[in-house]
Amino acid sequence: KRILSKGRLGPGEIIGVRIEKGKVFTNNQIKDYLAKEYKHFNSQIIDLDEKLSISNEKHNFDGEDLRRRQHTFGISLEDLELILHPMAEDAKEATGSMGDDTPLAVLSDKYRPLYHFFRQNFSQVTNPPIDSLRENKVMSLKTRFGNLGNILDFDTLTKENIYVLNSPILSNSQFNKFINFFGKNSVSIDCTFSNDQSLFDSIKRIQKDSEIAVRQGVTQLVLSDKAISDTRMPMPMLLCVGAINTFLIDKKLRGYVSINVQSGEALDTHSFATLIGVGATTVNPYIAFDSLYQRHEKKLFGQYSFDECVERYIKSVNARLLKIMSKWVYLF
């Protein structure tokens, strides 16, 4: 009879007790009290999901041009059928059997993307378990643009608007809307190099270009490898992102800019995870979407429209990224 209420705390919830006043404060009461003085700050958080919605998806390349680009980025028919297709058809990653007798990337005599040289090597058991399904209230892929300063420095934090998206994965239409939205505050950096240039010199070039752009007030860097041709080759995007991210950190400039990637290499969730892990803010896998369009035109997705295929693919990537986040991950 002396128990007034009972229950248990959910993920991210708290309670408070004022013993001298004999009061118990619930999770919502505490958070409402703390949030009162931050109303102005909340008005500066601008959600871009409606402005950058998935609609009227278009492809960039098709036919022989697309096949050449797929070959250039090391995307095989097996990748399209066993990895890409199930992600759009089932809205989740394909399930495969255990066992992989292929050589390690460093020992292989076949082309392996740079992503294959990185492994998710460690998973820490926690109690209670960190699970992206049961802990969905405190796990999010919400992505923040601009104003990347110290979140504890409130005076500085409230000087500029903060733009957020629910996912770091952008479709082709979203990416175009993104570029138009930020306009002059974004600059594109070409991540390809010609036959007479070295990869080392090209990396130095994009590092210098990024520094100049940030010092000129640009808030959105766009790293793109779309300019490949008979005379220009793509640089490994993972290397480009990591090089620019580290360079800007050393120059004390990283907090002023977001790094957005337009890559033909990214296809599976591991490639997205590694790109984000080395510093990418958003990723637009344009060749993956063009490959989906190619398969959609062949009526391989049944009743689904192309827009729906794109949405289902992004949904599968998001779900897997949350699973990767739910464990302690070290990349070697």
Protein language model annotation of sequence segments:
Residues 1-30, 34, 42-56, 110, ...:
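Phosphate/diphosphate-binding loops
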Residues 128-133, 216-223, 325-332:
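Flexible, glycine/charged-enriched surface loops at secondary-structure junctions
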Residues 185, 197-200, 204-205, 211-271, ...:
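Conserved structured catalytic cores and adjacent interaction surfaces
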Residues 90, 94, 98, 189-190, ...:
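Alpha-helical context
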Residues 192-200, 229-237, 297-309:
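Glycine-rich tight-turn/loop motif centered on a GG-T
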